[in-house]
Swiss-Prot record:
Pfam families: Neur. Intact N-terminus is essential for virion morphogenesis. Possesses two apical sorting signals, one in the ectodomain, which is likely to be a glycan, and the other in the transmembrane domain. The transmembrane domain also plays a role in lipid raft association. Homotetramer. Residues 31-469 are virion surface. Its EC number is 3.2.1.18. Ca(2+) binds at D293, G297, D324. This is Neuraminidase. One of its GO terms (molecular function) is metal ion binding. The chain crosses the membrane at residues 10-30. Inhibited by the neuraminidase inhibitors zanamivir (Relenza) and oseltamivir (Tamiflu). These drugs interfere with the release of progeny virus from infected cells and are effective against all influenza strains. Resistance to neuraminidase inhibitors is quite rare. GO terms for cellular component: host cell plasma membrane; membrane; virion membrane. It catalyses: Hydrolysis of alpha-(2->3)-, alpha-(2->6)-, alpha-(2->8)- glycosidic linkages of terminal sialic acid residues in oligosaccharides, glycoproteins, glycolipids, colominic acid and synthetic substrates.
Length: 469
């Protein structure tokens, strides 16, 4: 090859290499520009139209780093559209309950600044569970904790923390309330907060951190609500509220709420005679509540709520092993599904149960007369057969030598089914423990399991002699 041919060959190769490099740079530039603009677009699965990310609620902001040769491109992955919860999955099949959480608030109060509370409950958004309680406007090691046995003061507020985090000084005070309920509709939290004078209280409806609606007392006798989670189906949330006598006829209404706005109010109908402090759970396409009859029955009222047409029905749990306290012993207790049993009906305690086909799972104090101990079990035929008493799968949650209190249900949606969980309030202090002047609580939480489980007891555990007076 002569010199001229060498020069031509080298030049041709160089030109080809330069052309390839030029085309690569153009490809990189096009890719960079495309990815840059695509970070502001999302494909809608419904109609394949391009929609801006901006109006979509972002639950988690995920950043993906893409490396192309020496160029770094930062691309935001658009989140999926947040939707209302519909709770349409079936209920999980369980064999019993397994330990889930315990906050040890009273034990921690012996050496730290922990709120004085009562009326706790648990509720979950689609990704995380939270514990709530009504604070008394004071910590335990504080002279303001004296005489906190009283239920209704203007200083009480609804507290909210992640489940398992005790109510420390940094805890968020969601609203002013001496009675409350909370639930998440899939997009935001709804809080129902009752406060004010006994004869003229106000219920505030707070949605997504904003006051949206309110309603005043309709019977001028302690307007009150569930003290556990409400339930939202396809954007409509239901909450049971009562105003009137705690030991006689009262006026119960079921409120239907959409994004904090009251859209309908239905009166209680059916055979339930007295309804308070309902523990509600989704039973698609409706909502079912197990409540407290503080007037006539130690068997628990059932309230069925139709979310679509706002209709209401009520009855009583059929199980002859009844769930309220005080109650008759199991040999002499009765329940025939439709009416209160007129057995030690005056007074009571908040509790829960849920149907499982024809059977019923339930929890109650071990003591028949006081808020001591706690047990759960399943009653065969307890949902459909009057006065059924065949008990299986009994578990002790708190032994009979230790105090319990209110209890309630909450629901957790899994990949294939909806699990039922419950909490137990572990009350300490006055009236029973007179060495101290305060009344407060901790909680223990269990959830349904399809596995095996052992035995134990999970009381509050604080030594009252080590506690601030």
């Amino acid at each position: 090859m002569n010199p001229n041919q060498k020069i031509i060959t080298i030049g041709s190769v160089s030109l080809i290499i330069a052309t390839i490099c030029f085309l690569m740079q153009i490809a990189i530039l096009v890719t960079t520009v495309t990815l840059h603009f695509k970070q502001y677009e999302c494909d809608s699965p419904a109609n394949n139209q391009v929609m801006p990310c901006e109006p979509i609620i972002i639950e988690r902001n995920i950043t993906e780093i893409v490396y192309l040769t020496n160029t770094t491109i930062e691309k935001e992955i658009c989140p999926k559209l947040v939707e209302y919860r519909n709770w349409s999955k079936p209920q999980c099949k369980i064999t019993g309950f397994a330990p889930f959480s315990k906050d040890n608030s009273i034990r921690l109060s012996a050496g730290g600044d922990i709120w004085v509370t009562r009326e706790p409950y648990v509720s979950c958004d689609p990704g995380k569970c939270y514990q709530f309680a009504l604070g008394q406007g004071t910590t335990l090691d504080n002279k303001h904790s004296n005489d906190t046995i009283h239920d209704r003061t203007p200083h009480r507020t609804l507290l909210m923390n992640e489940l398992g985090v005790p109510f420390h000084l940094g805890t968020r005070q969601v609203c002013i309330a001496w009675s409350s309920s909370s639930c998440h509709d899939g997009k935001a939290w709804l809080h129902v907060c009752v406060t004010g004078y006994d004869k003229n209280a106000t219920a505030s409806f707070i949605y997504d951190g904003r006051l949206v609606d309110s309603i005043g007392s309709w019977s001028q006798n302690i307007l009150r609500t569930q003290e556990s989670e409400c339930v939202c189906i396809n954007g409509t949330c239901t909450v049971v509220m009562t105003d009137g006598s705690a030991s006689g006829r009262a006026d119960t209404k079921i409120l239907f709420i959409e994004e904090g706005k009251i859209v309908h109010i239905s009166p209680l109908s059916g055979s339930a005679q007295h309804v308070e402090e309902c523990s509600c759970y989704p039973r698609y396409p409706g909502v079912r509540c197990i409540c407290r009859d503080n007037w006539k029955g130690s068997n628990r009222p059932v309230v069925d709520i139709n979310v679509k047409d706002y209709s209401i029905d009520s009855s009583y749990v059929c199980s002859g092993l009844v769930g309220d306290t005080p109650r008759n012993n199991d040999r002499s207790s009765n329940s025939y599904c439709r009416n209160p049993n007129n057995e030690k009906g005056n007074h009571g305690v908040k509790g829960w149960a849920f149907d499982d086909g024809n059977d019923v799972w339930m929890g109650r104090t071990i003591s028949e007369d006081s808020r001591s101990g706690y047990e759960t079990f399943k009653v065969i035929g307890g949902w459909s057969t009057p006065n059924s008493k065949l008990q299986i799968n009994r578990q002790v949650i708190v032994d009979s030598d230790n105090r319990s209190g209110y209890s309630g249900i909450f629901s957790v949606e899994g990949k294939s089914c909806i699990n039922r969980c419950f909490y137990v309030e572990l009350i300490r202090g006055r009236e029973q423990e007179t060495r101290v002047w305060w009344t407060s609580n901790s909680i223990v939480v269990f959830c349904g399991t399809s596995g095996t489980y052992g035995t134990g007891s999970w009381p509050d555990g604080a030594d009252i002699n080590l506690m601030p007076i």
